[in-house]
């Protein structure tokens, strides 16, 4: 099984679309394990994550772990949590933050990796890019609406907002997220982690 994971990783590194990164010695940033039970899908990694080769090692990551109710060790070392961004590379900065993930990247690589993770019980969709792509929703559907209606997408998918500090105002304006959504998320994650 490890051979298949390594083959996919090598294919990602060698594909022409990623040549600009490979030439700079930049490796794709994701984590996929045959024993994974939870899959976290978010946007592309940020610049700091790419430089450190460590995802979610910032305030957003701490908040995400709090929301999930998992420890640092469970998040990074249990091998029960896969992390698959919509793009495995930091693509640069735009006018309003990091550039979005490439449109076809996840379509090409995610299915190959997911096929090797047969024990996934819950896919957590973090933010708009992941939610719209995986739930096949038009861009006109707002992330707030998606998260409010999260139960529609269970038991396979659980959409949430991005845990960025920039979303603090959103969290204050939408108290139902803390009172209704997060307890359910934590309950489901804990149940799966204890299997």
List each language-model region with its residue ranges.
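A polyanion-binding, active-site-adjacent surface
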Residues: 1-148, 153-194
């Amino acid at each position: 099984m490890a051979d298949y994971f390594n083959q996919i990783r090598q294919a990602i590194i060698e594909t022409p679309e990623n040549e600009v990164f490979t030439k700079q010695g930049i490796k794709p940033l994701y984590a996929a394990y045959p024993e994974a039970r939870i899959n976290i899908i978010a946007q592309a990694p940020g610049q700091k994550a790419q430089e450190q080769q460590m995802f979610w090692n910032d305030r957003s990551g701490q908040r995400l772990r709090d929301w999930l109710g998992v420890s640092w060790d469970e998040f990074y070392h249990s091998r029960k949590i896969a992390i698959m961004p919509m793009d495995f590379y930091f693509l640069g900065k735009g006018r309003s933050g990091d550039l979005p993930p490439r449109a076809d990247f996840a379509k090409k690589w995610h299915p190959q990796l997911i096929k090797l993770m047969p024990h996934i019980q819950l896919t957590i969709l973090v933010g708009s890019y992941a939610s719209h792509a995986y739930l096949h929703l038009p861009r006109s559907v707002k992330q707030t609406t998606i998260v409010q209606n999260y139960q529609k997408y269970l038991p396979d998918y659980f959409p949430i907002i991005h845990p960025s500090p920039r979303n603090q105002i959103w969290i204050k304006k939408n108290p139902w997220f803390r009172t209704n959504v997060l307890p359910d998320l934590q309950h489901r994650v804990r149940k799966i982690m204890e299997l």
